[in-house]
Amino acid sequence: MAAELAMGAELPSSPLAIEYVNDFDLMKFEVKKEPPEAERFCHRLPPGSLSSTPLSTPCSSVPSSPSFCAPSPGTGGGAGGGGSAAQAGGAPGPPSGGPGTVGGASGKAVLEDLYWMSGYQHHLNPEALNLTPEDAVEALIGSGHHGAHHGAHHPAAAAAYEAFRGQSFAGGGGADDMGAGHHHGAHHTAHHHHSAHHHHHHHHHHGGSGHHGGGAGHGGGGAGHHVRLEERFSDDQLVSMSVRELNRQLRGFSKEEVIRLKQKRRTLKNRGYAQSCRFKRVQQRHILESEKCQLQSQVEQLKLEVGRLAKERDLYKEKYEKLAGRGGPGGAGGAGFPREPSPAQAGPGAAKGAPDFFL
C-alpha cells in the first residue's frame, strides 16, 4: 500500500508534463456511465491516488486520471502525508518536520496506510463488498510494515479497535480519531489492531468448531434416543398391545416420538387388517370354487343317470308295444293261446289270470 502511494507521489511535476496533460483531449473517448451512488463515492477519492486497490470496486475498476494539484513530493518530508490526511478525513494532520516524525521511513509508511484507510472507508463500502472491519484491517496491516508486537490484550489497543469498528459501521470521520495523536502512538495502535484481530479470529474459530461439535453430538444423541424408542417395541408387540398399555410404556418420551410410534402402530394395524381381509377373501374364493367343482360333477352324474333312465324307458316302451301288438289278435281268435301278461299288469293281474287259464 505504501509502495502504491509512493508511486503516486513520484509522478512527474514538470511544467511541460502538466501542460501536456491539460491540453490532452479526453472528449473523444466514451465515458463509462456510473450510477449516482457510485459517482458520489468516486468523488470522495483523495486527490493524487491511482485507485489501484487490491479489492475491485465499480470505481476502482477504471483508474482515475492523476491530479497534479497536490503539492509536489519535494516540498517536505511529511507535507504530502499531512495534506492527504487533511483532504481525506477533514482533520489537519501533524505539522511536517515536527517531533511526531519518529521511525523514519517505516513510520511514514504506516501513517500513509492509516490515512489511506481512513480516507477510503467510504469508497470501499463494506456493506456492498460483504466485508467486515476486521477484513479491512487485516488487508491493510498485513500488506504493510510489521513491527514489534506489544501484546494483544492491551486496554488502549482494545479501545482503539472498538473506535475503529464504530467509525467503519457508521461511515463517519476518517482521521479525526486515528490521525490526531502522534506517529508513534498510531504505529503501536496499528500493530495492536493486527494482534487483537488475529486473537479474535482464533478464538472465534475455536468457539465455532466447539459449537458445531456440540451440535453434532446432540444430534447423534437424539438419533440414538429415537432408534432406542423405535427398537424398544417390535411390530407384533405394537399390534397386540392395548392402547392403555402402550400409553403407560411411552411415558417420559417426547411428543413427536410418541406420535411417530402411534402412527407406526396404526399403519401396522391397518396393514394387518388389510392382509387378513385379503386372506379371507382368497380362502372364501377357494371354498366356493371347490363347491362349484363338486356341484358341476354332481350335475354331470345326474345327467348321465337321466340318460340311462331314458334309454331304459325306451326299451320298456318298445317291449310293451310289441306285446300289445301280439296280444290283440290272440284275444280275438279264442282261448287257444294264453294271454301273456304285459309288464304293466305284472303282479296281482298275473295271479288273477292263472285260475282263468286252468278253468
UniProtKB/Swiss-Prot annotation:
Residues 40-105, 172-226, 322-359 are annotated as: Disordered. Keywords: Activator, DNA-binding, Isopeptide bond, Nucleus, Phosphoprotein, Transcription, Transcription regulation, Ubl conjugation. Residues 74-84, 210-224, 325-336 have a biased composition (Gly residues). One of its GO terms (molecular function) is RNA polymerase II cis-regulatory region sequence-specific DNA binding. It is found in: Nucleus. The modification Phosphoserine is found at residues 14, 49, 61, 65. The keyword Metal-binding does not apply. GO terms for cellular component: nucleus. Residues 260-323 form the bZIP domain. SMART domains: BRLZ. Residues 181-209 have a biased composition (Basic residues). GO terms for biological process: insulin secretion; positive regulation of DNA-templated transcription; positive regulation of transcription by RNA polymerase II; response to glucose. Residues 260-285 are annotated as: Basic motif. The keyword Transcription applies. There is a cross-link at residue 32 (Glycyl lysine isopeptide (Lys-Gly) (interchain with G-Cter in SUMO2)). InterPro entries: bZIP (IPR004827), bZIP_Maf (IPR004826), bZIP_sf (IPR046347), Maf_TF_N (IPR013592), TF_DNA-bd_sf (IPR008917), Transcription_factor_Maf_fam (IPR024874). The modification Phosphothreonine is found at residues 53, 57. Pfam families: bZIP_Maf (PF03131), Maf_N (PF08383). Expressed in brain, lung, spleen, pancreas and kidney. In the pancreas, expressed in the insulin-producing beta-cells of the islets of Langerhans (at protein level). Also expressed in the eye. Ubiquitinated, leading to its degradation by the proteasome. Phosphorylated at tyrosines. Belongs to the bZIP family. Maf subfamily. Transcriptional factor that activates insulin gene expression. Acts synergistically with NEUROD1/BETA2 and PDX1. Binds the insulin enhancer C1/RIPE3b element. Binds to consensus TRE-type MARE 5'-TGCTGACTCAGCA-3' DNA sequence. Forms homodimers. Interacts with NEUROD1 and PDX1. May interact with MAFB, FOS, JUN and PCAF. This is Transcription factor MafA. It comes from Mus musculus (Mouse).
